Amino acid sequence: MLTILHASDLQFGKPFRPRAGEAFRNLAFDVMPHLIVVSGDLTQRAKPREFKAAWDFLQRLPTVPLVVTPGNHDVPLYRIWERAVTPFWRWRHHIPRDVDSVVRVAGSMIVGLNSASPYRAIVNGRIQRHQLTFARKAFDETPPGGPRVLVVHHHFVSPPDGEGGAPLPGGRKILQKIEDMQVDVVLTGHIHQTFIASSRDVIPGDRAGVPLIHTGTTTSRRGRGPEHRKNSCNIVKVLEDTIEVTPHFFESRGSAFEPGEMVSVPRPGTPMKTAYPGTFPQED
């Protein structure tokens, strides 16, 4: 079994909610996962003090392997020269992780890909061919039966309410390659809503597709849709035949991340028994 604590869209800067940050830290120590994933947007405006605060925060979490990927907010928006010439300089200076990265944990292979695309998009992203080659080579080294996890910031499928902007361009072709790599689960953020989709939403088939697990904003005031004024993160457990996802929500007046309803989906390649659940149940 592989247990992952999945956060996203911390957005250190003006939107950051310190109480949510402290609640997430407490949850991390309660869970003590094998791995912590932060799928992009560590900062709000890619400023040095925001990157420093984000990394200081991550260093206060349990000392387990950490996967972080850039999001569109982690490249300069208004500093045009910097965006054009050295868009990831501040990331590389303050975050000691490559923008594309590989982490091995207890027989599992976790690959983080940078979907932020400062030259071609402001909000949306891109995944390039060389990045897919990078991921394939890493996954080819996975021990037999070991979980394969892919982390990107941008989403491949829109949430049920249609909010969140357009999915990644070329998503169908990318998801086909992800299926070919035998990836077990994709973890994303960006749209500030928690829900589960599947590569089967894009690519037809009679076997279970790759689960696409989205978490909302974990520590900012920018929750959207049903997560307005809420924060969220997921506990993801990769088991032999299934993947269990338990969303956790932090209310604006709360003091802790509280668990929602656990959802179990089949690992890719197994017979499909039920449709994917979409958004998680929300309590008012």
Language-model segment annotations:
Residues 1-5, 102-112, 143-147, 207-211, ...:
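Beta-strand-turn-beta hairpins that frame and shape the catalytic cleft
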Residues 1-60, 78, 134, 141:
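N-terminal active-site segment of His-dependent metallophosphoesterases
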Residues 7-8, 36-41, 65-72, 114, ...:
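Active-site neighborhood of phospho(di)ester-bond hydrolases with catalytic His/Asp-centered motifs
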Residues 13-15, 44-49, 53, 72-83, ...:
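Active-site environment of divalent metal-dependent phosphoester hydrolases
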Residues 52-134, 142, 177-179, 206, ...:
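Extended active-site neighborhood of metal-dependent phosphoesterases/phosphodiesterases
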Residues 139, 143-159:
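Short acidic, glycine-rich surface-loop motifs adjacent to enzyme active sites
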Residues 163-239:
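Conserved beta-sheet core of the metallophosphoesterase superfamily
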Residues 237-284:
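A short C-terminal boundary segment appended to hydrolase-like catalytic domains
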